[in-house]
Regions:
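Short, structured motif recognition centered on aromatic/hydrophobic residues
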Residues: 6-13, 29-32, 41, 45, ...
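Short, mixed-charge low-complexity intrinsically disordered segments
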Residues: 50-91, 125-148
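Short aromatic-glycine-(Arg/Gly/Cys) micro-motifs in beta-strand/loop hairpins
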Residues: 2-26, 76-100
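Conserved aromatic
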Residues: 35-36, 109
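A cross-kingdom feature marking solvent-exposed beta-strand/loop segments within repeated
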Residues: 17-34, 51-54, 97-105, 125-132
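Mixed-charge, glycine-accented linear interaction segment located at domain edges/termini
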Residues: 96, 103-144
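A cross-family "folded-core" feature that marks the main globular domain of proteins
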Residues: 8, 12-14, 23, 44, ...
């Protein structure tokens, strides 16, 4: 399990996709790209999609993500993306109360249970106490990182 911390943008692409019956249908597809700015995100997703889509397409939306770290699976069967909210638990000795801080991650896995296992694997090296407070499958088809 590897992870990458960066500025991530969620993008939506719209284009005419050829269906099995030969008819073209307008579809929206969702992707995540690593970028420094909105312009950089648009350039990156346009570059990536131009090699997969023959014909015209448009970038419908670009949104900064709520997460800054993504856990990438090394298992080739993990083809889905899950958004997970973890709560880190700390103890405030002054007030003698438990404090929880929420952090959101994007996790690659094939199933919901697989996503939980991948989170546990990624968090195994940390000393922090945490709980998974929410996890849900996303519509993202892929994540594109900057090339070195």
């Amino acid at each position: 399990m590897k992870s990458k911390t960066a500025n991530w943008f969620e993008t939506v692409i719209r284009y005419d996709k050829m269906q099995e019956d030969g008819m073209a249908k307008k579809v929206n597809e969702y992707y995540v790209v690593e970028a420094f700015s909105f312009g950089d995100a648009e350039e990156k997703i346009t570059e990536e999609m131009s090699s997969y889509i023959s014909g015209e397409f448009e970038v419908r939306n670009i949104t900064p993500s709520t997460y800054h770290e993504i856990f990438f699976s090394e298992n080739g069967n993990d083809d889905r993306w899950y958004k997970a909210r973890l709560q880190y638990i700390t103890f405030d000795e002054k007030t003698e109360k438990e404090k929880r801080t929420s952090v959101t991650y994007l996790v690659q896995a094939s199933t919901l249970n697989g996503a939980v296992k991948n989170i546990e694997e990624a968090m195994a090296g940390t000393m922090s106490d945490y709980v998974i407070s929410n996890i849900s499958e996303t519509k993202f088809l892929d994540v594109y990182v900057k090339k070195a």
